[in-house]
């Protein structure tokens, strides 16, 4: 079918087709066949179009880098810092295709997040804390796929995620005493983070055949810290910005 018009045709037994009286403004056609992925191609005098088999399930591996931190919002000048932390992640997942344009994308990822130099000053002293937690994160996203070129697809996705802390160290520095100590983030008497987190993710990706490039924003809905004094300001939440690379099998 010619996009933007009501002109269409069907192929013969050998897969050949002819389109006539195409308007000059028309630029692309869409080729569809049962059980195959549709493809939009630029109109040319002679076209050789190859369709890919439409899979219900497609596994993928992914890796990425990003920045994470906590959305510190307070009017207390004694609370400062919380610089964004550069992190890496990697994982596996699958696309379950409901249709040509919609799919479910569950995945399992190992994600290293955290923040640097979040500090508090007061009459009793001044200290800074850096946290480097590692989570096992499981997002379940709904994706919408749009064919925008002969080979490329634009993907928009969104959905919830759940995460469990599996490792991580923190460091506390006493600025007055000039001393520091390290501790486990999720276990022990000095642990400061809750082990479980959950939130929402949303993003977009561009896929070329088996390769995908993506951006994802994540926002935690649970309180990450075990203790947080209201005098320090609003309770912070996990936030993240991730840039990823995906290979689809």
Identify the function of each model-found stretch.
Residues 57, 82-88, 132-138, 152, ...:
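Residues that define the transmembrane beta-barrel architecture of outer-membrane proteins
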Residues 2-4, 28-41:
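A short, solvent-exposed loop/turn motif at the edges and junctions
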Residues 73-80, 123-130, 186-190, 227-233:
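Extracellular loop and loop/strand-boundary signature of outer-membrane beta-barrel proteins
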Residues 5-16:
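Short, acidic Ser/Thr/Gly-rich low-complexity loop/linker segments typical of extracellular
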Residues 54-56, 97-99, 111, 147-151, ...:
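Outer-membrane beta-barrel channels and translocator barrels
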Residues 113-116, 188-249:
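Predominantly the C-terminal beta-signal and adjacent terminal strand-loop region
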Residues 48-91:
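Short glycine/proline- and aromatic-enriched beta-strand/turn motifs that initiate or cap beta-hairpins
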């Amino acid at each position: 079918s010619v996009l933007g018009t009501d002109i269409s045709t069907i192929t013969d037994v050998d897969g050949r087709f002819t389109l006539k009286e195409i308007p000059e403004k028309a630029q692309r056609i869409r080729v569809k066949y049962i059980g195959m992925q549709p493809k939009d191609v630029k109109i040319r005098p002679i076209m050789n179009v190859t369709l890919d088999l439409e899979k219900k399930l497609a596994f993928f591996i992914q890796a990425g880098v990003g920045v994470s931190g906590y959305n510190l919002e307070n009017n207390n000048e004694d609370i400062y810092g919380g610089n964004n932390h550069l992190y890496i992640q990697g994982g596996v997942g699958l696309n379950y295709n409901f249709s040509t344009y919609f799919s479910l994308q569950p995945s399992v990822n190992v994600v290293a997040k955290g923040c640097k130099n979040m500090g508090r000053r007061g009459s009793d002293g001044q200290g800074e804390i850096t946290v480097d937690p590692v989570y096992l994160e499981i997002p379940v996203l709904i994706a919408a796929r749009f064919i925008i070129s002969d080979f490329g697809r634009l993907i928009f996705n969104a959905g919830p995620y759940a995460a469990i802390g599996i490792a991580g160290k923190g460091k506390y520095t006493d600025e007055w005493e000039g001393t520091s100590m390290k501790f486990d983030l999720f276990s022990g008497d000095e642990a400061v983070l809750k082990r479980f987190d959950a939130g929402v993710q949303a993003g977009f990706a561009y896929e070329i055949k088996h390769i995908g490039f993506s951006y994802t924003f994540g926002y935690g809905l649970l309180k990450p810290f075990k203790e947080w004094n209201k005098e320090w300001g609003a309770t912070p939440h996990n936030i993240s910005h991730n840039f990823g690379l995906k290979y689809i099998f």
